[in-house]
Amino acid sequence: MYNRPRMWDGQRILTSSKKPSITKKSYTLFLKPDKKVSPAKVGQVLSSHFTGTKYSSYGKWKGGYRPINVPTDVESHILHVPKEYAAIQWLTMASPANSVYLPFYTNIIDTSSQYKVDGDYQDPTNTKSAYWTYKTTAMVIEAYKHKKFIDSSTGKKTDLIYKDVNPTKKAVTKQLKANLAQSDKVAKTLSGDKLTAYLTEQNQKNADYAQKKWQTMNNSLIVHSNKLAPVTKSKLTFNK
């Protein structure tokens, strides 16, 4: 039962017209998706924890099935090879459900600084590290994913995902797609060393932009999580 429910979840997202059952003992190996698959759709599959179903590990987790996305994920990536050129690696660090897929051109001369792993970047207190920026989000969400608090701006109950993560993820993804479309246009006018230098520069700009937004969001997460932390009441006793 380790992998079958995860196969069901992937097929549920890509071929919902088939209406598969999570309790099936076998699944068709090859299926044609209902619609053309985009990097975003693949990301939806890789980020899924039975999202939007009664089996969600962020809900009642009926059945206790292991999801595709788990809190201990280290990274997730999608290799995208457009017809016009190759290639783009969509990379997210830590748990993809609470992170964002960044488009990285592969025809480059250097790796974005926050993704270089050496001694300093293995330190969880290092704010320059992309991994620890996104891992911080995953750790806070995992601790409080089942708890709600009153949103002071609306007076309604909400949780950390809907209040902080989802809006940030949506805004950052939209901006990254716009950045990619613009840099694609410029890249078509370049070649050789100028092209690779430009693509390397764009990767760094996107990495810096997304990480800054995520660090700002993490600050908000920590503030809001304080509202969810349990308060322990103790009774004091005194010797007479």
Predicted regions and their residues:
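C-terminus-biased signal that marks the final domain/tail of proteins
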Residues: M1-K240
